[in-house]
């Protein structure tokens, strides 16, 4: 039997650092991905259009490329907040034809996401309305939990640590990993107790999913 194509998903609310984390992993694997922020920025520079128009065009282009890759049954990589409806629904549909691998990056609070986005704006990046970030924060987790039973491989990272300017930025902390519905990290009680508050609903969902799978196999 031929191996199924893979859909790589870099997920997390704006400001989480998903591009830095997942992008590095994809580059190590020799893969590229559609980054809507980069697309929007390049479109604005090339055409002089406004931020809203560029964001809309980037979103539409991302959906177009996604749909084309799914139809062709080819490998694909995307970046998403998971805080909407359209992309999570498409990812769910893709699990029928693709092995879906998700790297989800989160921060302790919506306020920290907002602060990171503001810092990015000061460095020349584009802004995201605070209301959008606050709305996406709970939706992203809810959508991830809904996808969990169908995800082939999931890694959840905490990227909340703050450092002073000029200091070395620490690597994000792996707080959960699932492979085919089985929780493989954390592996001990002490590590489980160290789970950050924001990620506990995800761990609880993963543990519940695994327990349900074990009960069904008995």
Residue ranges and their predicted role:
Residues 20-74:
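Conserved substrate/cofactor phosphate-moiety recognition/catalytic segment
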Residues 13:
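P-loop (Walker A) phosphate-binding loop of NTP-binding proteins
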Residues 57-105, 140, 155:
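Glycine-rich phosphate-binding loop used to anchor ATP phosphates in small-molecule kinases
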Residues 147-218:
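NTP-dependent small-molecule kinase module
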Residues 98-144:
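A glycine- and Lys/Arg-enriched "phosphate-lid" helix/loop adjacent to the NTP-binding pocket
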Residues 7-9:
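Short hydrophobic/aromatic beta-strand immediately N-terminal to the Walker A/P-loop
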Residues 1-4, 69-70:
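Phosphate-binding P-loop
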Residues 17:
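Conserved glycine(s) of the Walker
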């Amino acid at each position: 039997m031929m191996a199924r194509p893979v859909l790589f998903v870099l997920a997390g609310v704006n400001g989480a650092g998903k591009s830095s984390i997942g992008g590095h992993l994809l580059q190590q694997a020799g893969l590229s991905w559609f980054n809507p922020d980069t697309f929007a920025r390049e479109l604005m520079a090339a055409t002089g259009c406004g931020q809203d128009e560029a964001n809309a065009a980037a979103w539409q282009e991302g959906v177009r490329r996604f749909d084309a890759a799914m139809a062709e049954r080819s490998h694909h990589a995307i970046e998403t907040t998971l805080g909407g409806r359209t992309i999570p629904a498409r990812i769910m549909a893709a699990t029928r034809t693709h092995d879906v691998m998700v790297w989800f990056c989160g921060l302790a609070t919506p306020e920290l996401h907002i602060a990171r986005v503001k810092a990015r704006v000061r460095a020349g990046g584009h802004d995201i309305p605070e209301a959008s970030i606050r709305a996406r924060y709970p939706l992203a987790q809810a959508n991830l939990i809904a996808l969990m039973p169908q995800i082939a491989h999931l890694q959840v990272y905490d990227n909340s640590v703050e450092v002073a300017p000029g200091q070395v930025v620490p690597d994000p902390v792996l707080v959960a990993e699932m492979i085919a519905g089985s929780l493989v990290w954390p592996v001990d009680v002490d590590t489980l107790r160290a789970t950050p508050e924001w990620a506990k609903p995800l761990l609880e969902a993963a543990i519940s999913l695994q327990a349900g799978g074990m009960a069904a196999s008995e």
